[in-house]
């Protein structure tokens, strides 16, 4: 949840890549995001995320969860990219964030933030390099107990 409060823009949509239980996108909706789309490669995550959203009073009119892989499914990417997001979240391991960094820019609106976390500190440099290589400039790095969160925007 580190950085979520700071980068959720009230009235703007959020995309959660690798949503798992949906905690981050649901929290963003509670913080005022207009809508959230969430994706996970595990189909079971869809039901879990919808259940957690319902427990927080969030309906499917504002919350869409899909099973799929944005690294391999071009149709899913095209569908998600029809909307541009003020905040794109990825709380997953470095081995997924690194290839995901090539896609993140497709989803961001002009001043949108790609907030990636779940990065073990020994891999943070690799993730930063991948973000930069893919046109994203890291402007904030937070570290806690050996874990790193990076916030990046499209490089200008």
Question: What are these model-derived regions, one by one?
Answer:
Residues 75-87:
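A short acidic, Gly/Pro-enriched loop at the edge of an enzyme's catalytic core
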Residues 98-113:
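A short glycine-rich, Lys/Arg-flanked "PGG" loop and its adjoining helix->strand segment in the class I
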Residues 137-156:
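Core SAM-dependent methyltransferase catalytic element
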């Amino acid at each position: 949840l580190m950085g979520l409060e700071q980068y959720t823009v009230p009235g703007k949509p959020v995309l959660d890549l690798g949503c798992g239980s949906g905690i981050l996108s649901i929290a963003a909706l509670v913080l005022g995001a207009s809508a959230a789309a969430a994706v996970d490669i595990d189909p079971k995550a869809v039901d879990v995320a919808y259940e957690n959203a319902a427990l927080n009073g969030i309906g499917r009119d504002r919350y869409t969860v899909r099973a799929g892989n944005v690294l391999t499914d071009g149709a899913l990417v095209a569908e998600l990219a029809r909307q541009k997001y003020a905040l794109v979240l990825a709380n997953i391991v470095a081995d997924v964030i690194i290839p995901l960094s090539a896609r993140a820019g497709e989803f961001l609106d002009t001043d949108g933030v790609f907030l990636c976390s779940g990065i073990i500190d020994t891999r943070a440099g690799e993730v930063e390099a991948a973000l930069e290589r893919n046109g994203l400039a890291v402007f904030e790095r937070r570290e806690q107990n050996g874990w790193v969160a990076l916030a990046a925007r499209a490089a200008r």
